[in-house]
Each structure stands twice: as C-alpha cells, then as structure tokens.
Amino acid sequence: MHRPNFRPPTPPYPSPGIGGWGGGNNFRGALGGGPRPPSPRDGYGSPHHTPPCGPRARPYGSSQSPRHGGNFSGARFGSPSPGGYPGSYSRSPAGSQHQFGYSPGQQQTYPQGSPRTSTPFGSGRGREKRMSNELESYFKPSMLEDPWAGLEPVSVVDISQQYSNTQTFTGKKGRYFS
C-alpha cells in the first residue's frame, strides 16, 4: 500500500531489516521529517506492524537505531537488578518508570481518599443532621464563643511587675536556671 511512496532507509538505519518495515519508514519520512519522532508509530500505530515492538526492537535497536538504543541503555542499567532501580534514575524505558510512577501515586491516593470516604460523621448521606447531633453532644454552646473576646490590652510595665512579683514569690529560680 505504501510502496509507491517508499524511500530507502536513511543513514541512521543501515540495516536492510529496518528498511523491510516499509510503511513505517514511509511514515517516518512523510510525517516527522526525521527518523526519531514518529518512530513510536511503527510499534503502536502502523497497521502493517501490529506485533509489539519487542521482537523488532531487540535485534535492530541495540546498535543501529538511535531511538531504540536510548531505550536499551536504560534497560541495560536496569537489567542487573530485577526492580530496575538504576534504570529509574536514568533515562529508562517506560516499564521501570511505571513501577515507580504509579505505586507512589497509589500510596498517596489511599491516605488522601480514605478520610473523604470515611469521615468521623459517617457517610455523606444525612451528614448535616448527624453532625449537628454530635456537635450538641460533644460541645457546649459556650465553647463555640470566642474565649479571647473579653481580653483587654495590657502595658509592658504591668507585665514586668507581674513577673518580678511571681519570681520573688516562688523563689524557684535555681530550679530552672543553673
């Protein structure tokens, strides 16, 4: 289907096997203008290459293709450890990023989500009625008033006199300051 518009492989793709992909190379030349950006179209979007990019990328990508070479550099770092810890810190394939990208997100989601679903007032239905009953049983109306409303301003002289009186009255300076 894409053979009339087919171009020979560009210099970063010297292998004849990569040129055999046909429609994918045509997509690269027509859309991206370069070999790198539309290359995911070969693995995901191209109708001629429905197999996943794994079998195709392993023989060719490690040496010739710059895109797959970048991916495999992360895979090489991640291969010594099964969890892919070093691969997650470098530019790595999406697999090791998903391991660390989604699991912390889920851990953050559960503590944030659980208080919303299970509030101290029960479920969301009828919450206003139950909240008013619990407020009346736990709190007195005097607690809802401002406790600092009756305060009056005090000068600094009064405070210093008060502290000097209490210190001489208690006589426990040595207990706190040695």
From Swiss-Prot:
It is found in: Nucleus; Cytoplasm; Cytoplasm, Cytoskeleton, Microtubule organizing center, Centrosome. GO terms for cellular component: centrosome; cytoplasm; midbody; nucleus. Residues 78-96 have a biased composition (Low complexity). GO terms for biological process: cell division. Residues 1-134 are annotated as: Disordered. The modification Omega-N-methylarginine is found at residues 56, 116. Residues 97-121 have a biased composition (Polar residues). The modification Asymmetric dimethylarginine is found at residues 36, 58, 67, 76. The modification Phosphothreonine is found at residues 50, 119. Transmembrane segments: none annotated. The modification Phosphoserine is found at residues 39, 46, 79, 81, 92, 103, 114, 123, 132. It comes from the Eukaryota. Its main location: nucleus. Phosphorylated during mitosis in the cell cycle probably by CDK1. Residues 17-34 have a biased composition (Gly residues). InterPro entries: MPLKIP-like_vertebrate, TTDN1/SICKLE. Residues 1-15 have a biased composition (Pro residues). Keywords: Cell cycle, Cell division, Cytoplasm, Cytoskeleton, Methylation, Mitosis, Nucleus, Phosphoprotein. May play a role in maintenance of cell cycle integrity by regulating mitosis or cytokinesis. Interacts with PLK1; phosphorylation-dependent. This is M-phase-specific PLK1-interacting protein.
